[in-house]
């Protein structure tokens, strides 16, 4: 089928050359509009209908949905367009110039995960999409590396219900059917300052936090005892105390203390239940010291995710790859896409290269990834 798509490596090169960093720090954050426009042109050239969706409450970020075919069901291939920032002093190559060396493609986003769209486009370049018996959707999202705002908004607003979805995160082509979630909170104690020579005239926030931490440790033990998912290498929800700040002088009663913590829930645990358990753990401190303890989110929470192991998608992909599905501890957009349809996480490149200086994708993934995309499209959109 005739089209004007550039060669695979030139598509890859153009994607890497188009910066699309997402960061909580405004000075580093970038719009992904230029990258979305690139993808829109290429998918239109293949005969897809393209919708560009502004994502609310972001700094000029967009989702893209390319669709072709008719009827219900079908297949969704998804990925995010953004990358993390880069540490200029630790890269030995230009992060925005695709460099091939020693059977590796170097550049920011080669593995995580702008390159996945180059594989999709290349796998479809010779396909007459008008002959599909079921729909094929390509979703490109924004801000996965920070808030996952793009996937959240798409899942909340779309009417699409594909038969199944694949998110092309770097899994070394090992299919992933489940991962833990992530919830991070700030616990803040507001005390009353005063001179350390007269403790009764103040309320020491560090002492109150000591009480709160003891109860949080009891919650950690409870989570470990009560909840299990044996497929994970760490088969229980983890709770970590990551940072604490409080006080300003040894001779002053501490007026404020703040603890940052996270919990990584198992699939099947709801965020509401988890918040309830945290609230119950801290209730004695709140009751004894009314108005002095607050809990706030550091980042929007991400639930755990699991694709049913007996679903057709799992069976088909395991047969195509000759590999069993696995589970991982890191988070993806899968919990949000899973609300629409059964979802697997599966893509080229290693997660060990994600967020690293001199990020790369090994060229050994090129041929099997093209073949896999062609096979899953054929199976779910032509059968």
Curated annotation (Swiss-Prot):
It is an enzyme of class 3 (hydrolase). It comes from Klebsiella pneumoniae (strain 342). The active site is at 82, 144. The keyword Cytoplasm applies. One of its GO terms (biological process) is L-arginine biosynthetic process. GO terms for cellular component: cytoplasm. Its cofactor is Zn(2+); Co(2+); glutathione. GO terms for molecular function: acetylornithine deacetylase activity; zinc ion binding. SUPFAM superfamilies: Bacterial exopeptidase dimerisation domain, Zn-dependent exopeptidases. Keywords: Amino-acid biosynthesis, Arginine biosynthesis, Cobalt, Cytoplasm, Hydrolase, Metal-binding, Zinc. It is found in: Cytoplasm. This is Acetylornithine deacetylase. HAMAP family: ArgE. Zn(2+) 2 binds at residues 112, 145, 355. Binds 2 Zn(2+) or Co(2+) ions per subunit. Its EC number is 3.5.1.16. Catalyzes the hydrolysis of the amide bond of N(2)-acetylated L-amino acids. Cleaves the acetyl group from N-acetyl-L-ornithine to form L-ornithine, an intermediate in L-arginine biosynthesis pathway, and a branchpoint in the synthesis of polyamines. Its main location: cytoplasm. Pfam families: M20_dimer, Peptidase_M20. Belongs to the peptidase M20A family. ArgE subfamily. It catalyses: N(2)-acetyl-L-ornithine + H2O = L-ornithine + acetate. Homodimer. Pathway: Amino-acid biosynthesis; L-arginine biosynthesis; L-ornithine from N(2)-acetyl-L-ornithine (linear): step 1/1. Zn(2+) 1 binds at residues 80, 112, 169.
